[in-house]
Amino acid sequence: MSKAASQYATLEDLPSKPKRPQTGFFIYKSEVFAKRRTECPTLKVPEIVSKISEEYKALPEKEKQKYEEAYRKEKATYDKQNDQWKEKYGDIEKSLKDQAKKALKEKTKKSKAAEKELEKSKKKAPAAAPAKKDDKKAPAKKK
């Protein structure tokens, strides 16, 4: 493992990957959601989102294009950042995933071996004989 890789012991230690950009619909939704919520305070969130979805579908193509263009710009930035992340940390991530997979296999193997051993010991140990009741009756009392 390289010197850079040695500072990352687990996948959680790696810097987080860039987040994917929001689609045109989600950009639109984030712009109008608060307004729709105040217009219809009795509606539940899924109902509001459903209405926003219908609105977005009904938007003229020219207006939709504005949101799609914003998405494409964010996507280009994301792709660039993601490529840089993969170039810098991709091999380290793969190595750490492989290590985690091997560790899990080993743990599973040990667990199964312990399970088999337990089954063997149960079969070898004789079952405890049930306690016998004393058939003798209590002696009769003398008068």
From Swiss-Prot:
<keyword id="KW-0158">Chromosome</keyword>
<feature type="region of interest" description="Disordered">
    <location>
        <begin position="1"/>
        <end position="22"/>
    </location>
</feature>
<dbReference type="GO" id="GO:0005634">
    <property type="term" value="C:nucleus"/>
</dbReference>
<dbReference type="InterPro" id="IPR050342">
    <property type="entry name" value="HMGB"/>
</dbReference>
<keyword id="KW-0539">Nucleus</keyword>
<dbReference type="GO" id="GO:0003677">
    <property type="term" value="F:DNA binding"/>
</dbReference>
<dbReference type="Pfam" id="PF00505">
    <property type="entry name" value="HMG_box"/>
</dbReference>
<keyword id="KW-0238">DNA-binding</keyword>
<feature type="modified residue" description="Blocked amino end (Ala)">
    <location>
        <position position="70"/>
    </location>
</feature>
<feature type="compositionally biased region" description="Basic and acidic residues">
    <location>
        <begin position="100"/>
        <end position="120"/>
    </location>
</feature>
<dbReference type="InterPro" id="IPR036910">
    <property type="entry name" value="HMG_box_dom_sf"/>
</dbReference>
<dbReference type="GO" id="GO:0005694">
    <property type="term" value="C:chromosome"/>
</dbReference>
<feature type="DNA-binding region" description="HMG box">
    <location>
        <begin position="18"/>
        <end position="86"/>
    </location>
</feature>
<feature type="compositionally biased region" description="Basic and acidic residues">
    <location>
        <begin position="131"/>
        <end position="143"/>
    </location>
</feature>
<protein>
    <recommendedName>
        <fullName>High mobility group protein B</fullName>
    </recommendedName>
</protein>
<feature type="region of interest" description="Disordered">
    <location>
        <begin position="100"/>
        <end position="143"/>
    </location>
</feature>
<dbReference type="InterPro" id="IPR009071">
    <property type="entry name" value="HMG_box_dom"/>
</dbReference>
